[in-house]
Structures are given as C-alpha cells and as structure tokens.
Amino acid sequence: MAERDNAFNRAPQSERLHIALFGRRNVGKSSLINALTGQHIALVSDVPGTTTDPVIKSMEILPLGPCVLIDTAGFDDSGKVGDLRTERTREVIKQTDIAIVVTDGTSLDEEIAWTKLLKQADVPYVAVLNKVDLMEEVPSTLLDNIAKRLGGEVIAVSALQGTGLDLLRQTLARLVPDQGKQSLTGDLAKAGDTVLLVMPQDPQAPKGRLILPQVQTLRDLMDKGCIAICCTTEDIDRSLAALREPPQLIVTDSQVFDIVEQKKPEGSLLTSFSVLMAAHKGDIRYFVESAEAIDRLTEQSRVLIAEACTHAPLAEDIGREKIPRMLRKRVGEGLQIDIVAGKDFPEDLTSYDLIIHCGACMFNRRFMLQRVEQCRAQGVPMTNYGIAIAHLKGILNKVSLP
C-alpha cells in the first residue's frame, strides 16, 4: 500500500528533468545508469546490444532533484532490427533535457555525429570516459582529445568503482536548463486569492482519481497560498453563492467553457486547465494565433488531432468525439480529421491545414516544444484543445492567458 501511495504523491514523470545516456554498444551506459542511481535498473552484459528499447527510470538524484533517466540502445547497432533500435534512440533526443555521451575512448567518429545531433536540437551534454578502472592511468592527452573532438566537458568515470560520479552529478546540475520556477497559473492568481475550479467528472479518469492537470493546478494554487474551491458543473451556482466575494479566478474544464462563461461574475478571470497546460508546456501565443486557422477550414481541409495519452477512448472522448463534432458542425461533414496518440506524430505535416494538440500533461516541456517548432518550421498552424474550443464557442477573447 505504501508503494501505491508513493506513486500517487511523487512528481509526475512529465515534470521531471529528463537525462538520457547515449553511446556505442558495450561502452558501459547501463553500468553507468546503475551506478548513478545506486540500483540495478538496466540489464548489464558483455553481449553487444543487450539494451534494445529505451529503459526509463524515475527517481530523485541529488543535487538534481526529480529526474527521469533514460538508457538507450547503442547507436552503432546494425542490421534491420539494429536500425530500428537506432531510430528509437534518435527519437529519445526529442525529450532529452541533458545528454550524457558515454565513450570508452577507442573510437569517436559516431560520438561526433551524435553530438552534432544534440547540438542541432539544442540539448546540453557532457561526455563521459567510462571504464577508467581498466586503465593504469588516464592520460590527460586522451581527455583533451575527447574534449576537443566532441566539443564539451569530459569526465573520467568508473561505473564499477564509483570514481567520478560525484563530479558527474555536479556537472549535470550545472547543465540544467534555466527555465526559472514556473507557475502553472502564472500571474492569474496570487497569494490570498480565491480560485474556483470547475471540474466535471471525467469518465477517462480512474475511479477515485482526478486527472493530472487538475491535480497540478491544485498543487500550484496551494503553493502560492491561494484558497482553492472545487465543484462540478452542476454546483457552480451554489459554490459562487457560498462566497462572500466573487473568486479572482475561475479555472474550468474546456468542455464547459460556455456554461461557465455565462455564470462567471463580472470581476472574475476565466481560463481552463487545458489553456494553463498550453502555456506550461508549449507556446500559448502561437496556439492563440493558430486558432484563427479554424475560420479558414473548408470541407476540403485536413486536420490532425494529437493526443499525448494512449488510453482506450471512451464515449464522448474530447479529442476523438467532441472536437471533431464541433469542427464538422461548423465546416461540414467532408472535413478530413486524422487522430494520433502517444509519441506517434508525422514527420511531414505539410498536408495538414491545422494541428490541434491536447494539453500534453504526459509530455515534458522540451518534447512538446519540439512539436511546436516542427509545426512552425513547416508553416502549419498548431493550437490546443482548450484554445480551439474557446475559439469555436466564440469566447476566446474572454479567456485569460497565463
């Protein structure tokens, strides 16, 4: 039971620092990840290609805090299956906040190619010369050569003996991207404010559970010192009547935007959980600007709806049922709508007139921003569930953005 409670209380994986290990087969990536965590997480073997799919582990690492460690397959894997493994390793870059490039110093050609990919993706990295326990002495010329050719800092490590691990942790802490302390509600709420959270019971959520954006918003408001009051759509009137003064902010599920907007006191700000997630994970200004593309859609247009979750859809699913129905009601039944889930996302988006993405609560910010940049680079408008719904209901100009 304690383990289950732990899972409910720990930081969501999407909010953790993502650290990925890259390197050729048998340079000791799995041994290093086990040494860093102090646990036997990754399978270690002398057989090349032991790690096939990326191995992911969430844990706390001082002084870094909550992290996700990702052990990848060797990027020198060969053959048809090896090529697939290498492609999966390449995909990991999209969600990586910091990379560790592991080498044994015997060859650097492939490491150079991969550090170029990391630089192109703007991912900070540190090189690790592993297995130094097999050397009588680590030549400074070897470290200098690795640093020169890979273009970054190099740390000599023995995953077996634990040498250099403290220095590696300190170096990783220095490389953490400086995003400042991000508040989910931004400047929409401050200490002492009363905030009303309108939360219809979501059939997608497990029994007895709230969906992640609701949990994160509640925690954000508590951290700020706000007074948070929760209600369902049916209890909005009673909740407002119970307050001496109108709430400074109302956060609602996007699906009932119009209902809440009609009941909102004049002095209260209005936003949605999806809009908050759009600003937290993506580019909210780009999403608002892109929503105007909805007005240009015709029955010959093509729309892609992207959902981060991979849950089995239920009736009245917002991405698969409600938004498509709203779009076709406005544009016409001929509108083509494609749906993708999880990490499935087309490389070529140019055949689409609009991308509508969920709040991405299951993705880390870097992964979501990578999708935003992909859309922007290909000239394809991209918006968010909450922004799209507000635009379709004609109330986007009344929604407050964080």
Feature annotation, model-predicted:
Residues 49, 73, 104-106, 130-134, ...:
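Short, ordered loop/turn segments at secondary-structure junctions
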Residues 57-65, 70, 80-154, 183-187, ...:
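Conserved C-terminal guanine-recognition region of P-loop GTPase G domains, centered on the G4
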Residues 42-46, 177-185:
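Active-site phosphate-binding and catalytic loops of NTP-dependent enzymes
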Residues 37, 73-74, 104-105, 255, ...:
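Short glycine-/small-residue-rich Rossmann-like dinucleotide-binding loops
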Residues 28, 135-138, 142, 158-178, ...:
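Conserved GTPase G-domain signal focused on the G5
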Residues 193-402:
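P-loop NTP-binding site
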Residues 21, 101, 127-129, 197, ...:
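Structural beta-sheet core signal
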Residues 2-83, 87, 91-94:
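Conserved G1/Walker A P-loop phosphate-binding module
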